[in-house]
Amino acid sequence: MLGRSLTSVLIVPTGIGCAVGGYAGDALPLARAIASVSDRLITHPNVMNGASLYWPLPNVAYVEGYALDRFAAGDWQLQPVHCNRIGLLLDAAIEPELRIRHQQVAEAAQATLGLSVTAAVITDAPLGVTLRQADSGSTWGTIDRPDSLLRAADQLLKAGCEAIAVIARFPDDPGAIALQDYRQGQGVDPLAGAEAVISHLIVREFQVPCAHAPALQPLPLDASISPRSAAEELGHTFLPCVLAGLSRAPRYRSATESIAESIRPESVDVVIAPETAIGGPGILHWAARGIPILAVAENRSTLDLRPVDLGVPVQHLQTHLEAVGWLAAYKAGLDPAALSPGDRRLSYLNHSVQQATSG
């Protein structure tokens, strides 16, 4: 094939209540559409994870959020793999029955999907996850024992694991208003912000693929829940999608290494993100290098930070359908503006020539 292949990046930040991507796997249809018009799509677990539901896409790189920022900064490159040996990291706070449920998911993934889940470890202390919510509505969280988390991760890596699936015990509060709103398709995922903190710690320390699945007791049956949150009502764990994603997640390598067929930071051609969430470090790095940023207005969030507030140049698009069309035109070698009505006149850099022409 002649010409450059199209590498797209899709970012939907977690914990800010995005209209698309703020729930359990509800950004997967968007990822599938973008992947279909791209040669390669790079995205993160919040986009691809749907609890018990997932959709393997051969041209999608599953990259943890902190790693994505380091990649955008030019510090890391991505090394595609055939498969990863996955290690299971379980919080000591998980009750025995709930731990067995997660163990069964890992064993089922080996038996039915052929994944390589090679070792498991229980932390030497309860991790102590605490959930928080900012005044804006965005969620975040902390863990009391990051040292225990990192020691357990180190054990798995020394045992030959190449990617880590973390299962931390999250607080149960089925009566919480925030949780009830989320189940009804309103508000913000109360778990999302804390999940990101856990995976960031491991990736920052060890530079390996990592994703998180919270351990919770099953919620009471509610026939009125929103379809957008329904994926989290299935089964006993959120682990299946994490194992599927990590199984072929690219490994993280220093950008200074010489690696054949790696995905280099300069490979990125275009970035798609919610219009109110383009202030993250990754997007700012890409924008500074002149990479087109497609800011989608319909993907609202709890944030109210516009591109103009940050001085970030973007392509303002109303819908994700418009973004998919923009990508298709761009891949075909067209100026996407050529598909809209109106005159596009040539602009002279020499001001006097411009005046003479217009006069």
Swiss-Prot record:
First-listed, main subcellular location of the protein, grouped into a coarse class: membrane
| Keyword annotations | Cell membrane, Lipoprotein, Membrane, Palmitate, Signal
User: What is the protein's membrane topology class?
Assistant: Lipid-anchor
Q: Does the keyword Nucleus apply?
A: no
Query: Does the record's keyword annotation contain Metal-binding?
Result: no
Leader peptide range in chain numbering: 1-17
**Pfam families from the UniProt entry:** DUF3326 (PF11805)
Compartments, as annotated in UniProt: Cell membrane
Q: Which InterPro entries match?
A: DUF3326
Q: Where is the lipid attached (N-palmitoyl cysteine)?
A: C18
Q: Which PROSITE patterns match?
A: PROKAR_LIPOPROTEIN
Cellular component annotations (GO), alphabetically ordered:
plasma membrane
Q: What is this protein called?
A: Uncharacterized lipoprotein syc1174_c
Q: Which organism is it from?
A: Synechococcus sp. (strain ATCC 27144 / PCC 6301 / SAUG 1402/1)
